Amino acid sequence: MKERKYFGTDGVRGLVGEHPINPEFAMKLGWAAGRVLSENGTKKVMIGKDTRISGYMLETALQAGLIAAGIDVVLLGPMPTPAIAYLAQTFRAEAGIVISASHNPYYDNGIKFFNCRGLKLDDKVELEIEAMLDEPMTCVESDKLGKASRLTSADGRYIEFCKSQFPQSLSLEGLKIVLDCANGATYHIAPSVMRELGANIITHACEPNGVNINHECGATHVDTLKRKVLEHNADVGIAYDGDGDRVMMVDHNGRVFDGDDLVYIIACQAAQDDNLGGGVVGTVMSNMGLENALKAKGIEFARSKVGDRYVMELLQQKGWTIGGESSGHVLNLDLISTGDGIISSLQVLAAMVAQNKTLQDLGTGFTKYPMKMINVRYTPGTDPTKAPAVLAAVAEVEQTLGEKGRVLLRKSGTEPVVRVMVEAEQEKLVIDSAEKIAAVVESMSKQTD
């Protein structure tokens, strides 16, 4: 299959104001997507965004391009990414478009698409849109132009949906929860969901101003959350990322529970309820300890490429429902079609309440292997991972580790870095091995400059 030019592992991403994240390209992308998507007959698309200041600009440009292609646009305003997927599905729209750069700083932004089933677009459709971008932009006849409207009930609809995924027989009454919304898209959703289910909520980073999204807060910066959990003697802390599709949690002692931990807890609860529906999908980055812990409980485990779209693909191939990434993307296809930070955290909270256990208690039985990851920048257009010296260094480390460890070398799908990851039972061996491989990768990268 032809390689995509603009679409990466999570849509189109970049620095605001630079190609392709500028008004001109966004309008052309809206038009191209409108032309491709309208071939299916439905002429309605929903657009949502996170809280970045550039969202207004990109939203308007996308809207103009779609309308020029004859597509009706429904504006959702600031909403979590999974909410946009859900609403596009329930409103029978041809697509949901998300304007967000997830956990990245405010000066980055991105555009990604969900189809009418709430799933990310197939590679084939993305290639069709890219091919249409090469065509000159035209406008449909005036009487066939699209229209724009705003769905003012979007937040209320999604709050009720999230609450409906929490067991009717349970309540969060008596739980004190610190909630970090990353000054992002969950700021007006998650607190309402938790409060209406009975929890005592202490909020942090719930006041977006357009430029503070993910700034020293959220799922990628949990130090403040840890401190606040301890300060307030809270039962648990929850941190979402800027667009609400990732989640990290903190127990009452300040220990961080990442995506691997949460997948383990959710899968174990599902197995206990006789509702697992097969095995669990992780990625090549999932900790070896997760695989071993699940297998010890008789739960099959499979690995996909990195990216929640690939976790989804493998889940669908196997007919399973639960999977996720250590970064905090957690999927449960019985509940929603994409990773949802709020719903994933509700599943963990439900397990705490149902079993009358702390988050710490639920994590017993899963011990992570020591892991070291080093990011090495490289020149775009080159591939140091295929250099003979790098392959030799990897082979040497793999021979030393044997079956008690593993090495992963991969290029990021969103930035020009090679990720060097080593896992093993002994921490010193892990660090030494990762640094050894990274040094060779770096030397090869410099040679290609």
Swiss-Prot record:
Q: Which UniProt keywords apply?
A: Isomerase, Magnesium, Metal-binding, Phosphoprotein
Q: Which residues form the active site?
A: S102
State what protein this is by name: Phosphoglucosamine mutase
Q: Does the keyword S-adenosyl-L-methionine apply?
A: no
Q: Which cofactor does it need?
A: Mg(2+)
Q: Can you tell me which residues bind Mg(2+)?
A: S102, D241, D243, D245
Which reaction(s) are listed as its catalytic activity? alpha-D-glucosamine 1-phosphate = D-glucosamine 6-phosphate
The record's annotation in PROSITE patterns points to: PGM_PMM
Q: Name one GO biological process term.
A: carbohydrate metabolic process
Q: How is its cofactor bound, per UniProt? A: Binds 1 Mg(2+) ion per subunit.
Q: How is it modified after translation?
A: Activated by phosphorylation.
Q: Which organism is it from?
A: Pseudoalteromonas translucida (strain TAC 125)
Q: Which gene encodes it?
A: glmM
> Which PANTHER family did the record assign?
PHOSPHOGLUCOMUTASE (ALPHA-D-GLUCOSE-1,6-BISPHOSPHATE-DEPENDENT) (PTHR42946:SF1), PHOSPHOHEXOSE MUTASE (PTHR42946)
UniProt entry tagged with the keyword 4Fe-4S: no
- Which Pfam families does UniProt cross-reference here? PGM_PMM_I, PGM_PMM_II, PGM_PMM_III, PGM_PMM_IV
Q: Which residues carry this modification: Phosphoserine?
A: S102
